[in-house]
């Protein structure tokens, strides 16, 4: 966009990227240093919260802009950091508004990791009604069906799903496979990347699936799902 807007400008912006495993902070730090040697003017990421704090410290010291897009529990606003992720308090209030509007008397919070539970802890502590916490784990077949089946047996119908985007679509498909996608069931998905998932498989189930937009922070209803 900048290059197109200023085609005759004295410089052009050239993006460079690299992939690194989620917990490999050392490689993230080393690759960032190599970028800085090339004259990099800004760093976006990493997406992993495990590595981001190390990169943030380096870029603050070098006074290089650092842009984050992930949830950050500490939200340390340093001189060169810009975090584009909605503040946890704003998301918590949005989730509370949704469940209160629907007048849910109880809800099952389905999560897939300790990090997921930490993201939802403000909601759990603020919700004045009954919240059941259920973690889903892979069974010996490599699926979530065992965990989901046990949740189904409780008879619950109102669910909040807090899962990583990497597994979210599979969790929804397997919930449908075990009979948790009917007109009686309601889902609120907290992952802000829900729009990247194809929900066509659930359009005739009668299930209400609701997500929250990252950009406008308004509730989007997927009618007829």
For every predicted segment, state its role.
Residues 1-15:
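Signal peptide-proximal N-terminal region
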Residues 27-30, 50-54, 93-94, 144-145, ...:
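Short alpha-helical segments and helix-capping/turn motifs at coil-helix boundaries
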């Amino acid at each position: 966009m900048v290059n197109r807007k200023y085609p005759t400008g004295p410089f052009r912006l050239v993006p460079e990227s690299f992939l690194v495993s989620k917990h490999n902070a050392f490689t993230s730090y080393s690759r960032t240093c190599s970028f800085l040697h090339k004259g990099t003017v800004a760093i976006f990421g990493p997406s992993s919260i495990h590595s981001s704090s190390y990169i943030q410290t380096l870029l603050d010291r070098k006074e290089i802009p650092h842009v984050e897009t992930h949830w950050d529990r500490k939200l340390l606003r340093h001189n060169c950091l810009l975090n584009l992720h909605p503040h946890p308090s704003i998301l918590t209030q949005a989730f509370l508004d949704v469940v209160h509007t629907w007048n849910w008397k109880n809800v099952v919070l389905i999560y897939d990791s300790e990090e997921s539970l930490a993201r939802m802890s403000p909601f759990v502590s603020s919700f004045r009604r009954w919240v059941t916490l259920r973690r889903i784990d892979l069974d010996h077949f490599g699926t979530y069906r065992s965990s989901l089946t046990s949740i189904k047996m409780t008879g619950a119908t109102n669910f909040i799903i807090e899962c990583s985007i990497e597994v979210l679509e599979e969790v929804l498909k397997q919930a449908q496979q075990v009979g948790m996608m009917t007109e009686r069931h309601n889902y609120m998905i907290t992952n802000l990347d829900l729009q990247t998932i194809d929900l066509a498989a659930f359009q005739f189930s009668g299930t209400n699936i609701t997500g929250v937009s990252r950009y406008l922070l308004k509730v989007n209803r997927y009618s007829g799902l």
